[in-house]
Curated annotation (Swiss-Prot):
Residues 33-211 form the Eph LBD domain. It is a single-pass type I membrane protein. The modification Phosphotyrosine is found at Y605, Y611, Y830, Y977. The chain crosses the membrane at residues 550-570. It catalyses: L-tyrosyl-[protein] + ATP = O-phospho-L-tyrosyl-[protein] + ADP + H(+). Receptor tyrosine kinase which binds promiscuously GPI-anchored ephrin-A family ligands residing on adjacent cells, leading to contact-dependent bidirectional signaling into neighboring cells. The signaling pathway downstream of the receptor is referred to as forward signaling while the signaling pathway downstream of the ephrin ligand is referred to as reverse signaling. Residues 330-440, 441-536 form the Fibronectin type-III domain. The gene is Epha6. ATP binds at I636, G637, A638, G639, E640, F641, G642, E643, V644, K662. This is Ephrin type-A receptor 6. Residues 960-1024 form the SAM domain. Residues 630-943 form the Protein kinase domain. It comes from Mus musculus.
Length: 1035
């Protein structure tokens, strides 16, 4: 077959060329390919070199769009030993390291050509050579490197010519690495009948892209296909790095493994991969990929890209208010001020202002002025009055005024303030009220003097008041140690203007106040009088004087014996009278401590909230620890108030013990400090093996910087360790480094619990314990709660997360941040006024009415039992809090966890009685669990013990009698599921009583409300069946 025949073939199939051209044109626009040569786009002659001249022929035809189609063909199949070469022009490699050659060609089947079996071939060879510049017409085939032998996937025959069928082959070969500036390609024909329709040379790149708001430039992949090129991106305009953005360029030009990202800066939001400025009236306060927000009420902005909206005139934003909070204004004045006065106290009450300014942090201050008859002439009251609880920063809308003076006009100005009052230049609004104290009350006493003093006693007298307005009934004397002012005081009474006070400390200064009581009431307390008791020396001198008198009297002779005898009898009688009087006064004397009566022999538990200064409660109930005895080792977590670290505590004369140190974070508010110290004050009153033990507190002294910077960096950030330059390491001998000047941290030091919180511990060791081991854990928790209940405390946040486990698997109750002390009434409950409640663990009455009691703790204990037996599963699983509340109201209770004995689940159900008086006491729970531990075989037989527990509701309520399962479903309005139950084989009540929530889902009950109703009814059915079986009946 000659060249003319091939040319004729191509011309016959010319109508395919436009289609071919269009297809190759699409490929040339692949985004990750850079084309170096494409013969289909060359408008002029190619000018490729052929060797020999009569080998390859160039054929150029025009397609229907008048674009040239360059083709090279050769078909010297009749002659043997063909060696025809076709070489391209010099091709610049650009930035490529590896190139790809795409060839489109047709090839004639040798079997379709007669008489050429020995000379016809069906392959050709592809070669290349690298060069830094063009060789011109020089061509040395021996210098070329072979790339591959190219064979056709399809070849055409004479029949294809007749049927006008074009069989076009496409082959791609890769070449590399290319190190010089350019290269040549060469095609060797060795006796084939072939037409080279097009040649395209390209290399691959990872194209420019934007990912996660980061731009990545064009990148050339490495020659080695197994390695990736790491590319760091740059953030788009108005964006900033959150994590370093990276992509990896693969060998095929694909971007892989995106890491990091950029986020839109403040004032900008992400829209379709770029950051756009917030429109006027909108803002974005923090960098991130969230949308701009509309300005909150009473604020606006009129420019773009705003990070915070500005408050309108008269409105303000406090320093700690988030930008999303509406601007607020100071409140109006309080309303409806009223007073109530008696002999000793003046009570001021008022209503909240009509306009709170849009804030909840409302406080009040009371300013006192003394006015004469002319109310325009007033002066400050000074420090004579006492305000309970205080006169500034009041949260409640009332205050008690003490120590006021009779016959005085007092004007009280009550100011209302909130968090932005200090930002306003306008005067604080107030409401004033004038109170004239009672003219009938007696005036104050005159001067007070010390008649004599001993080591333990003081004899005092004073001037009666100038105006008593009636007979003086008695005097009330209040006294306390000067160094312990307002911490502890005692009082006594005397009918005369004198008193002998006994039971005092030697060489101690006491403060005395006296007020008068008449039929018309009390006077105010007098000014302070200071007197000091004697020391041992003065008492010895007095005793020596008495001895001298006795000796002189004895020498006087027998004649004075009768007189002396009479003298001693009279003296003895007087002393007996004085002692009797002192004893009577001692009985009447009442010792007061922070407003609580102290009775001998009865331990009283004091609510820390009754202390105006929380540090006073801490120092009374908790031991102050010298911080040099503490060594901090590492951070183990974060609590509500700050970080929690582990460390060691050195006790004098004992070995070091591991401890946990709870810290108060920097920038805390007074309320946070008070709550933080309150927890320590509560823990310090507990002493039980199942209650977390308080080792002590650090509130006074400076703290050594040992390991703090390395392990508790927030100390340094919070400014607790001002002046510390660098922490000193502990020496090899274990000695502590020199002291470093430091600030005043606040810490609570408790025993260290190696296994952490119970819920995490159980999840980590799922299935590792026997049932008796789990019951032992539950018994420890119940024992700790019994101790708290006996003391009159309500925990309010009992959950597995608040139970800590030590290395011996002893469980201890912790986290007393929500605890409240109860009054003497054993059925008393604590009512909260706000705050978050852990819905899944809290009793219904506590959720609905905020009424907490030991019975609500029993409900929470039932949830803890369920957590323990399920190895730390989340109660009520993925149900929302609202669904939990509704489900409990409808009677739903948690089913028994897998493998949970019936007796334990029945105890849970008993704890979850809706009527709180029917729930078991912790005493009964401990007793029941003790039975199980002593007799493990009773785990499946002690259900009856639960049903007869004290405070049990008694017999199970009457349950309707159903003949069929269908009747039962109809009674709970679930009759539509009869066929589901029948088809699944649940045809008897015995089978139904064993159904779980998974069984109910499996038979096709999809709606959650229907699932809850059926499960609740099954639980009631199960309890009823168990009860009648215990009574000897059968279902």
């Amino acid at each position: 077959m000659g060249g003319c025949e091939v040319r004729e073939f191509l011309l016959q199939f010319g109508f395919f060329l436009p289609l071919l051209t269009a297809w190759t044109g699409d490929c040339s626009h692949v985004s990750n390919q850079v084309v170096l040569l494409d013969t289909t786009t060359v408008m002029g002659e190619l000018g490729w070199k052929t060797y020999p001249l009569n080998g390859w022929d160039a054929i150029t035809e025009m397609d229907e769009h008048n674009r040239p189609i360059h083709t090279y063909q050769v078909c010297n199949v009749m002659e043997p030993n063909q060696n025809n070469w076709l070489r391209t022009n010099w091709i610049s490699r650009d930035a490529a390291q590896k190139i790809y050659v795409e060839m489109k060609f047709t090839l004639r089947d040798c079997n379709s050509i007669p008489w050429v079996l020995g000379t016809c071939k069906e392959t050709f060879n592809l070669y290349y050579i690298e060069s830094d510049e063009s060789h011109g017409t020089k061509f040395k085939p021996s210098q070329y490197i072979k790339i591959d032998t190219i064979a056709a996937d399809e070849s055409f025959t004479q029949m294809d010519l007749g049927d006008r069928i074009l069989k076009l082959n496409t082959e791609i070969r890769e070449v590399g690495p290319i190190e010089r500036k350019g290269f040549y390609l060469a095609f060797q024909d060795i006796g084939a009948c072939i037409a080279l329709v097009s040649v395209r040379v390209f290399y691959k790149k990872c194209p420019f892209t934007v990912r996660n708001l980061a731009m990545f430039p064009d990148t050339i992949p490495r020659v080695d296909s197994s390695s990736l090129v790491e590319v760091r991106g740059s953030c788009v305009k108005s964006a900033e790095e959150r994590d370093t953005p990276k992509l990896y360029c693969g060998a095929d030009g694909d971007w892989l493994v995106p890491l990091g990202r950029c986020i839109c800066s403040t004032g900008y939001e992400e829209i379709e991969g770029s950051c756009h400025a917030c429109r006027p009236g909108f803002y974005k306060a923090f960098a991130g990929n969230t949308k701009c927000s509309k300005c909150p009420p009473h604020s606006s902005t009129y420019v773009e890209a705003t990070s915070v909206c500005h408050c309108e005139k008269g409105y303000f934003r406090a320093e700690k208010d988030p930008p999303s909070m509406a601007c607020t204004r100071p409140p109006s004045a309080p309303r409806n001020v009223a007073f109530n006065i008696n002999e000793t106290a003046l009570i001021l009450e008022w209503s909240p202002p009509s306009d709170t300014g849009g804030r909840k942090d409302l406080t009040y201050s009371v300013i006192c002025k003394k006015c004469g008859l002319d109310t325009t002439q007033c002066e400050d009251c000074g420090g004579g009055l006492r305000f309970i609880p205080r006169h500034t920063g009041l949260i409640n809308n009332s205050v008690v005024v003490l120590d006021f003076v009779s016959h005085v006009n007092y004007t009280f100005e009550i100011e209302a303030m909130n968090g932005v009052s200090e930002l306003s230049i306008s005067p604080k609004p107030f409401t004033a009220i004038t109170v004239t104290t009672d003219h009938d009350a007696p005036s104050l006493i005159g001067m007070m003097r010390k008649d004599w003093a001993s080591q333990n006693s003081l004899a005092l007298s004073w001037q009666a008041p100038a105006f008593s307005n009636g007979a003086i009934l008695d005097y009330e004397i209040k006294y306390y140690e000067k160094e312990h002012e307002q911490l502890t005081y005692s009082s006594t009474r005397s009918k005369a203007p004198s008193v002998i006070v006994t039971g005092l400390k030697p060489a101690t200064t006491y403060i005395f106040h006296i007020r008068v009581r008449t039929a018309t009431g009390y006077s105010g307390y007098s000014q302070k009088f200071e007197f000091e008791t004697g020391d041992e020396t003065s008492d010895m001198a007095a005793e020596q004087g008495q001895i001298l008198v006795i000796a002189t009297a004895a020498v006087g002779g027998f004649t004075l014996l009768v007189i002396l005898t009479l003298f001693f009898l009279i003296t003895g009688r007087c002393q007996w009278y004085i002692k009797a009087k002192m004893k009577s006064e001692e009985k009447r004397r009442t010792h007061l401590q922070n407003g609580h009566l102290r009775f001998p022999g009865i331990k009283t538990y004091i609510d820390p909230d009754t202390y105006e200064d929380p540090s006073l409660a801490v120092h009374e109930f908790a031991k102050e620890i010298d911080p040099s005895r503490i060594r901090i080792e590492r951070v183990i977590g974060a609590g509500e108030f700050g970080e929690v670290c582990s460390g060691r505590l050195k006790t004098p004369g004992k070995r070091e013990i591991p401890v946990a140190i709870k810290t108060l974070k920097g920038g805390h508010m007074d309320r946070q400090r008070r709550d933080f110290l309150r927890e320590a004050s509560i823990m310090g009153q507990f002493d039980h093996p199942n209650i977390i033990r308080l080792e002590g507190v650090v509130t006074k002294r400076s703290f050594p910087a040992i390991g703090v910077e390395a392990f508790c960096p927030s100390f340094l950030r919070a400014g607790f360790l001002n002046g510390i330059q660098a922490p000193h390491p502990v020496t090899a001998g274990g000695s502590l480094p020199p002291r470093i000047p430091a600030g005043r941290p606040v810490m609570i030091v408790v025993e260290y619990m190696e296994n952490g919180s119970l819920d995490s511990f159980l999840r980590k060791h799922d299935g590792h314990f026997t049932v008796i081991q789990l019951v032992g854990m539950l018994r420890g928790i119940a024992s700790g709660m019994k101790y708290l209940s006996d003391m009159g405390y309500v925990h309010r946040d009992l959950a597995a997360r608040n139970i800590l486990v030590n290395s011996n698997l002893v469980c201890k109750v912790s986290d007393f941040g929500l605890s409240r002390v109860l009054e003497d009434d054993p059925e008393a409950a604590y009512t909260t006024t706000g705050g978050k409640i852990p819905i899944r663990w809290t009793a219904p009455e506590a959720i609905a009415y905020r009424k907490f009691s030991s019975a609500s703790d029993a409900w929470s204990y039932g949830i803890v039992m369920w957590e323990v037996m399920s190895y730390g599963e989340r109660p009520y699983w993925e149900m929302s809090n609202q669904d939990v509340i509704l489900s409990i109201e409808e009677g739903y209770r948690l089913p028994a966890p897998m493998g949970c004995p019936p007796s334990l689940h029945q105890l849970m159900l008993h704890c979850w009685q809706k009527e709180r008086n029917h729930r078991p006491k912790f005493t009964d729970i401990v007793s029941f669990l003790d039975k199980l531990i002593r007799n493990p075989s009773a785990l499946h037989t002690l259900v009856e013990d639960i049903l007869v527990m004290p405070e049990s509701p008694g017999d199970v309520p009457e349950y309707p009698l159903f003949v069929t399962v269908g009747d039962w479903l109809d009674s709970i309005k679930m009759g539509q599921y009869k066929s589901n139950f029948m088809a699944a084989g649940f045809t008897t009540f015995d089978l139904i009583s064993r159904m779980s929530i998974d069984d109910i889902r499996r038979i096709g009950v999809i709606l959650i409300g229907h699932q809850r109703r059926i499960v609740s009814s099954i639980q009631t059915l199960r309890l009823h069946m168990m009860h009648i079986q215990e009574k000897g009946f059968h279902v």
